[in-house]
Protein backbone atom coordinates (compact mmCIF):
# COMPACT_ATOMS: atom_id res chain seq x y z
CA UNK A 1 0.00 0.00 0.00
CA UNK A 2 2.75 2.47 0.88
CA UNK A 3 4.49 1.78 -2.43
CA UNK A 4 1.30 2.41 -4.39
CA UNK A 5 0.54 5.52 -2.34
CA UNK A 6 3.94 6.99 -3.24
CA UNK A 7 2.74 7.35 -6.86
CA UNK A 8 6.16 7.08 -8.44
CA UNK A 9 6.46 8.38 -11.99
CA UNK A 10 8.69 6.88 -14.67
CA UNK A 11 10.83 9.09 -16.88
CA UNK A 12 12.82 8.05 -19.93
CA UNK A 13 16.02 10.06 -20.47
CA UNK A 14 16.62 10.58 -24.18
CA UNK A 15 19.32 13.25 -24.47
CA UNK A 16 22.99 12.44 -23.82
CA UNK A 17 24.55 15.08 -21.56
CA UNK A 18 28.05 13.75 -20.92
CA UNK A 19 29.22 13.80 -24.55
CA UNK A 20 28.56 16.42 -27.18
CA UNK A 21 30.30 14.80 -30.18
CA UNK A 22 27.46 13.60 -32.40
CA UNK A 23 29.42 10.78 -34.08
CA UNK A 24 30.65 9.46 -30.72
CA UNK A 25 27.14 9.60 -29.23
CA UNK A 26 25.78 7.64 -32.23
CA UNK A 27 28.56 5.06 -31.83
CA UNK A 28 27.79 4.60 -28.12
CA UNK A 29 24.12 4.11 -28.96
CA UNK A 30 25.07 1.45 -31.53
CA UNK A 31 27.44 -0.37 -29.16
CA UNK A 32 24.73 -0.64 -26.50
CA UNK A 33 22.58 -2.76 -28.82
CA UNK A 34 25.41 -4.75 -30.39
CA UNK A 35 25.71 -2.86 -33.68
CA UNK A 36 29.41 -2.58 -34.53
CA UNK A 37 29.67 -1.66 -38.18
CA UNK A 38 29.91 1.36 -40.47
CA UNK A 39 31.04 4.61 -38.88
CA UNK A 40 30.76 3.13 -35.40
CA UNK A 41 33.16 0.31 -36.26
CA UNK A 42 35.57 2.80 -37.82
CA UNK A 43 35.67 4.81 -34.59
CA UNK A 44 36.64 1.67 -32.67
CA UNK A 45 39.17 0.63 -35.31
CA UNK A 46 40.85 4.04 -35.16
CA UNK A 47 41.63 3.47 -31.48
CA UNK A 48 43.29 0.06 -31.86
CA UNK A 49 46.80 -0.03 -30.38
CA UNK A 50 49.05 -3.09 -30.35
CA UNK A 51 51.41 -1.79 -27.65
CA UNK A 52 49.67 0.64 -25.29
CA UNK A 53 51.92 2.52 -22.84
CA UNK A 54 52.24 0.82 -19.46
CA UNK A 55 50.98 3.99 -17.77
CA UNK A 56 47.59 3.69 -19.48
CA UNK A 57 45.03 2.08 -17.14
CA UNK A 58 43.76 -1.31 -18.35
CA UNK A 59 40.13 -2.21 -17.78
CA UNK A 60 39.26 -5.81 -16.93
CA UNK A 61 36.04 -7.61 -16.09
CA UNK A 62 37.23 -9.39 -12.93
CA UNK A 63 39.14 -8.38 -9.80
CA UNK A 64 41.48 -11.38 -10.16
CA UNK A 65 42.72 -10.02 -13.50
CA UNK A 66 43.10 -6.52 -12.04
CA UNK A 67 45.08 -7.69 -9.02
CA UNK A 68 47.32 -9.91 -11.13
CA UNK A 69 48.21 -7.10 -13.56
CA UNK A 70 48.72 -4.49 -10.84
CA UNK A 71 50.96 -6.74 -8.75
CA UNK A 72 52.96 -7.77 -11.83
CA UNK A 73 53.61 -4.13 -12.72
CA UNK A 74 54.52 -3.35 -9.12
CA UNK A 75 56.97 -6.26 -9.01
CA UNK A 76 58.74 -4.89 -12.09
CA UNK A 77 59.72 -1.72 -10.22
CA UNK A 78 62.96 -1.57 -8.24
CA UNK A 79 62.87 -0.70 -4.56
CA UNK A 80 61.15 -1.94 -1.44
CA UNK A 81 57.42 -2.56 -1.33
CA UNK A 82 55.36 -1.06 1.49
CA UNK A 83 52.10 -2.69 2.59
CA UNK A 84 49.53 -0.32 4.10
CA UNK A 85 46.55 -1.78 5.97
CA UNK A 86 43.20 -0.09 6.51
CA UNK A 87 42.11 0.66 10.07
CA UNK A 88 38.51 -0.47 10.58
CA UNK A 89 35.99 -0.28 13.40
CA UNK A 90 32.27 -0.71 13.97
CA UNK A 91 29.67 -3.41 13.20
CA UNK A 92 31.01 -6.30 11.12
CA UNK A 93 28.36 -6.22 8.38
CA UNK A 94 28.90 -2.50 7.85
CA UNK A 95 32.68 -3.02 7.71
CA UNK A 96 32.20 -5.73 5.10
CA UNK A 97 30.00 -3.40 3.05
CA UNK A 98 32.67 -0.66 3.06
CA UNK A 99 35.46 -3.11 2.21
CA UNK A 100 33.45 -4.53 -0.69
CA UNK A 101 32.28 -1.24 -2.19
CA UNK A 102 35.05 1.32 -1.71
CA UNK A 103 37.55 1.94 -4.50
CA UNK A 104 40.34 1.97 -1.92
CA UNK A 105 41.59 -1.53 -1.00
CA UNK A 106 41.88 -2.69 2.59
CA UNK A 107 45.46 -3.72 1.82
CA UNK A 108 47.40 -1.25 -0.33
CA UNK A 109 50.77 -2.25 -1.85
CA UNK A 110 52.98 0.65 -2.98
CA UNK A 111 56.57 1.54 -3.73
CA UNK A 112 58.29 4.53 -5.38
CA UNK A 113 57.36 4.63 -9.06
CA UNK A 114 54.00 2.92 -8.58
CA UNK A 115 51.14 4.25 -10.69
CA UNK A 116 48.24 5.14 -8.40
CA UNK A 117 44.80 6.69 -8.64
CA UNK A 118 43.18 8.98 -6.08
CA UNK A 119 39.88 7.60 -4.80
CA UNK A 120 38.32 10.72 -3.25
CA UNK A 121 38.05 14.43 -3.92
CA UNK A 122 40.17 16.59 -1.60
CA UNK A 123 39.48 20.30 -1.20
CA UNK A 124 41.48 22.83 0.78
CA UNK A 125 40.12 26.12 2.19
CA UNK A 126 42.48 28.47 0.34
CA UNK A 127 42.43 26.71 -3.04
CA UNK A 128 40.00 27.53 -5.84
CA UNK A 129 40.46 24.03 -7.29
CA UNK A 130 40.57 20.63 -5.53
CA UNK A 131 43.97 19.40 -4.38
CA UNK A 132 43.14 16.11 -6.11
CA UNK A 133 40.03 14.42 -7.48
CA UNK A 134 38.61 10.91 -7.66
CA UNK A 135 40.10 9.15 -10.70
CA UNK A 136 43.16 11.40 -11.01
CA UNK A 137 46.39 9.52 -11.77
CA UNK A 138 49.79 10.07 -10.18
CA UNK A 139 53.08 8.34 -9.34
CA UNK A 140 54.33 7.45 -5.87
CA UNK A 141 57.50 9.37 -5.00
CA UNK A 142 58.01 8.21 -1.43
CA UNK A 143 56.30 6.54 1.53
CA UNK A 144 56.64 8.44 4.81
CA UNK A 145 55.30 7.69 8.28
CA UNK A 146 51.66 8.73 8.01
CA UNK A 147 51.74 9.79 4.35
CA UNK A 148 52.27 8.64 0.77
CA UNK A 149 53.95 11.25 -1.41
CA UNK A 150 52.41 11.34 -4.90
CA UNK A 151 53.34 13.40 -7.95
CA UNK A 152 50.45 14.16 -10.30
CA UNK A 153 50.71 14.29 -14.08
CA UNK A 154 50.69 18.09 -13.79
CA UNK A 155 53.82 17.90 -11.63
CA UNK A 156 52.22 18.74 -8.29
CA UNK A 157 53.70 16.83 -5.34
CA UNK A 158 51.11 15.93 -2.68
CA UNK A 159 51.45 14.32 0.75
CA UNK A 160 48.45 12.03 0.88
CA UNK A 161 47.29 11.19 4.40
CA UNK A 162 44.70 8.70 5.60
CA UNK A 163 41.06 9.38 4.83
CA UNK A 164 38.14 7.99 6.83
CA UNK A 165 34.93 6.74 5.25
CA UNK A 166 31.86 5.98 7.35
CA UNK A 167 28.98 3.64 6.65
CA UNK A 168 26.68 6.43 7.85
CA UNK A 169 28.24 9.90 7.91
CA UNK A 170 25.63 11.05 10.43
CA UNK A 171 26.24 8.20 12.88
CA UNK A 172 29.57 8.15 14.74
CA UNK A 173 28.87 4.61 15.95
CA UNK A 174 28.61 3.25 12.40
CA UNK A 175 31.51 1.40 10.77
CA UNK A 176 34.61 3.40 9.85
CA UNK A 177 37.26 2.57 7.25
CA UNK A 178 40.51 4.56 7.38
CA UNK A 179 43.03 4.15 4.57
CA UNK A 180 45.18 6.21 2.21
CA UNK A 181 42.75 7.24 -0.57
CA UNK A 182 44.76 5.55 -3.31
CA UNK A 183 44.76 2.37 -5.37
CA UNK A 184 47.18 0.91 -7.88
CA UNK A 185 46.16 2.24 -11.27
CA UNK A 186 47.75 0.04 -13.92
CA UNK A 187 44.42 -1.81 -13.98
CA UNK A 188 40.89 -1.66 -12.58
CA UNK A 189 37.56 -3.37 -13.21
CA UNK A 190 35.09 -1.86 -15.64
CA UNK A 191 32.61 -1.76 -12.76
CA UNK A 192 34.93 0.28 -10.52
CA UNK A 193 35.81 2.61 -13.42
CA UNK A 194 32.19 3.68 -13.85
CA UNK A 195 31.76 7.29 -12.85
CA UNK A 196 35.48 8.06 -13.04
CA UNK A 197 36.97 10.58 -15.45
CA UNK A 198 39.95 8.86 -17.10
CA UNK A 199 42.17 10.63 -19.63
CA UNK A 200 42.70 7.29 -21.38
CA UNK A 201 42.14 3.56 -20.89
CA UNK A 202 43.02 0.29 -22.62
CA UNK A 203 40.54 -2.55 -23.14
CA UNK A 204 41.42 -5.94 -24.58
Name what the model sees in each region.
Residues 122-123, 127-204:
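Conserved helicase C-terminal RecA-like lobe
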Residues 1-133, 139-141:
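Conserved helicase motor core of P-loop NTPases
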Amino acid sequence: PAWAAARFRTFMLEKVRRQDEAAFVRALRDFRVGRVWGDSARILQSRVRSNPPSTMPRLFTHNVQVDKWNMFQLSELPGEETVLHAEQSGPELQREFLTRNLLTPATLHVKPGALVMFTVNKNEPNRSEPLFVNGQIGTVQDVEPGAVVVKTKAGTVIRVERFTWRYDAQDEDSAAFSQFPLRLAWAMTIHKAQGLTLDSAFLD
